[in-house]
């Protein structure tokens, strides 16, 4: 008989979706089958509200080895190697249980990468919280950072960079996005396919418990009263187990016995089995009585929906089972044959002799509902506010100090010093610069990585904000001397059932796609996190873009810090009146308002070409993009460096704009570079049609900024450093 509305509510299914299940099965589903559909048809697993928009993104390119649809994307980097990378969200679990939520987010993205046969080389993160002046937000931040560091450090993968942003909109919905990069030979990439009828299905790794049941469903619902009491749905991670699992999986892959492999992440055994079968067009028979369990009395429903960590499902060639078992026994891990690949296209779940579920794999995956949800074009009244009409701040040195002390701009050393950024000895540029850089062992190459996003811009104008996010992520990679070769995205939004939220999403995806096409950067995969709302209040639309870039000669990698006195500093690109959505307007006037900067993608591409030519030729000593806080903040950051004050300088800013605009405008497509090859740089800039302005030379213990004969700012480096370290002082203070 049909189930009641209370059952559907608990499983986050609509009545229409239930009726669709009945049609697909030709009968009423049993309770276990309802559970399977609940997790597989969740937003988290099915992308049912986003798929129609994501299909428009550019996913192909000459370097793309694996695009969307697998555990991670992959791009060729030469020498028979591929960079494997992906970004994922763990927002909801991190709000409920910050340490474990963040830790298992790192664990999940690591498994996505080594499931492809790649050894993880680096992790980045993108974090967003409410204002750190609130004790609750500081506790969330501390828990998340400890979780990321605790898992990554113990596993032995360096956390090499990321971003931390503080905004009111993330007060009740922090964002925790993690990116992992690994390396693999292009001819040794593994995929999540249950191929070969008769082949054996193995369960490997940790035992199954009741943690994480309905984690995917929880991640597909907004928060309300009592959300913080959902700790049972948050998984518990064991990084030491994961490290052993990594080594065992990579060794098993080398035996040639493995046909396909997928980690048990969201939706656990249900997702891994049904997706592997659907991709291969096969069926899978599973006996959950053979699944290793750490709790007694677990039902088929609980075993199939558990999201216990550090588990994998793999398919081995029939007759090679002993080879697989031998490897995992060597590493003291469970490797239990729990089923076989069949030819009927169905997922059949047994508990001993009893049939608990019998569902077509395609019904759980390919035939999940796809919604073209209604949306309205975003029209934010705050975006039409004329911020240029606001009174100019009279104390420009004070504004610069205030911007450097702003939590989003201030030094994040308190965060990244809790991460091991150099384990495995591949890190060339760690946290604190525009992009992280890791070497590719056995070659002269290196890879640069960056995550970027600007929810403030996207709230004001989703289309333009998304274009700006892509451009800034690519620009940061270029500032490290790397050519962008691939991107991944994590799209964090509110409730897609609200037309205004869906409008934000549609325009964001459109902007992201347009920018990636213009800059020739394919998207190889990503993640969508909807329902980032509490009591109807949504976060800013926040697309986080992860970009990977290639440096042919690792010796040419750049950082953003001034190196030596006497080097000339150039501003590449022109400054315009771009204060909309800026840090200046937020810090000085207390508003998020105005039209975000308008991005010229042609100018952006020309800037990239110039900087890459100059970096590759060895003309540049440093490079830093101008973004939050404008050129004044960028110059201060170059002088401060990653670890403390270096040399300053006296710099004259070009143009006749109002002084506060000259200093703090956030016009895109600009970069600060230092060089001793001035003539060559100027000639190349002319050839690439990029404005090139000499600001001055590095030297002294003060930062002085002028406009013609007018002095705008004159501050000693010690004061700048004190302002820049304000966040560390706040976070290091004794807990209340």
Model-flagged regions — what are they?
Residues 1-736:
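Glycine/proline-enriched, intrinsically flexible loops and inter-domain linkers
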């Amino acid at each position: 008989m049909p189930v009641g509305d209370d059952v559907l509510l608990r499983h986050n299914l609509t009545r229409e979706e239930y009726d669709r299940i009945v049609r697909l099965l030709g009968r009423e589903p049993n309770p276990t089958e309802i559970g399977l559909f609940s997790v597989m048809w969740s937003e988290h697993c099915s992308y049912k509200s986003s798929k129609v928009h994501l299909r428009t993104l550019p996913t192909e390119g000459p370097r793309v080895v694996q695009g969307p649809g697998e555990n991670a994307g992959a791009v060729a980097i030469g020498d028979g190697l591929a960079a494997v990378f992906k970004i994922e969200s763990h927002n909801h679990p991190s709000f409920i249980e910050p340490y474990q939520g963040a830790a298992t987010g790192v664990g999940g993205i690591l498994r996505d990468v080594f499931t492809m046969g790649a050894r993880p080389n680096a992790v980045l993160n993108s974090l967003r919280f409410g204002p750190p002046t609130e004790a609750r937000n500081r506790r969330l931040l501390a828990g998340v950072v400890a979780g990321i560091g605790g898992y990554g450090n113990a596993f032995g993968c360096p956390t090499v960079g990321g971003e931390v942003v503080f905004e009111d909109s993330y007060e009740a919905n922090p964002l925790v996005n993690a990116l992992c990069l690994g390396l693999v030979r292009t001819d040794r990439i593994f995929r999540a396919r249950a191929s070969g009828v008769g082949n054996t299905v193995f369960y490997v790794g940790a035992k199954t418990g009741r943690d994480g049941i309905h984690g995917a469903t929880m991640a597909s619902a907004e928060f309300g009263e009592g959300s913080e009491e959902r700790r049972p749905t948050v998984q518990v991670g064991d990084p030491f187990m994961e490290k052993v699992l990594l080594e065992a999986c990579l060794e098993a892959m080398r035996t040639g016995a493995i046909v396909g492999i997928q980690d048990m992440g969201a939706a656990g055994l249900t997702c891994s089995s049904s997706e592997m079968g659907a991709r291969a067009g096969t069926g899978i028979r599973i006996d959950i009585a053979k699944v290793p369990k750490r709790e007694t009395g677990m039902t088929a429903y609980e075993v199939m929906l558990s999201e216990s960590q550090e588990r994998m499902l793999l398919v081995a060639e029939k007759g090679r089972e002993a080879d697989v078992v031998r490897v995992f026994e060597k590493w003291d891990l469970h490797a239990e044959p729990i089923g076989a690949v069949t030819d009927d296209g169905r997922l059949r779940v047994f508990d001993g002799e009893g049939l608990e579920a019998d569902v077509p794999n395609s019904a759980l995956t390919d035939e999940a509902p796809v919604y073209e949800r209604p949306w309205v074009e975003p029209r934010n009244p705050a975006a039409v506010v004329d911020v240029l009409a606001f009174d100019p701040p009279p104390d420009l040195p004070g504004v610069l100090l205030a911007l450097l002390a702003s939590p989003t701009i201030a030094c994040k050393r308190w965060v990244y010093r809790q991460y091991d950024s150099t384990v495995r000895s591949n890190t060339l540029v760690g946290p604190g610069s525009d992009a992280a850089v890791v070497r590719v062992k056995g070659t002269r190459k290196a890879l640069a990585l960056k995550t970027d996003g600007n929810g403030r811009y996207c709230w004001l104008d989703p289309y333009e904000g998304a274009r700006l996010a892509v451009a800034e992520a690519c620009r940061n990679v270029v500032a490290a001397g790397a050519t962008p070769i691939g991107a991944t995205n994590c799209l964090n939004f509110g409730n897609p059932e609200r037309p205004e939220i869906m409008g934000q999403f549609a325009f964001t995806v459109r902007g992201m796609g347009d920018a990636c096409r213009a800059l020739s950067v394919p998207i190889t995969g990503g993640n969508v996190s909807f329902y980032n709302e509490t009591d109807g209040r949504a976060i800013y639309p926040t697309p986080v873009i992860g970009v990977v870039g290639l440096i042919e000669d690792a010796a040419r990698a750049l950082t953003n810090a001034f190196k030596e006195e006497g080097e000339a500093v150039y501003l590449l690109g022109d400054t315009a009146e771009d204060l909309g959505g800026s840090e200046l307007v937020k810090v000085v006037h207390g508003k998020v308002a105005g039209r975000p900067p308008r991005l010229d993608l042609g100018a952006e591409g020309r800037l990239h070409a110039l900087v890459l030519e100059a970096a590759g030729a060895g003309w540049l000593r440093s490079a830093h993009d101008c973004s939050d806080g404008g050129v004044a903040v960028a110059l201060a950051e170059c002088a401060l460096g990653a670890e403390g004050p270096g040399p300053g300088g006296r710099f004259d800013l070009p143009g006749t704009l109002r002084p506060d605009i000259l200093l703090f405008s956030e016009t895109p497509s600009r970069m600060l570079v230092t060089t001793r090859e001035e003539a060559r740089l100027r000639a190349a800039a002319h050839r690439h049609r990029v404005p090139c302005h000499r600001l001055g030379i590095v030297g002294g213990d003060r930062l002085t900024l002028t406009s013609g004969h007018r002095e705008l700012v004159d501050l000693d480096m010690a004061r700048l450093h004190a302002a820049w370290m304000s966040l560390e002082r706040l976070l290091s203070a004794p807990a209340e």
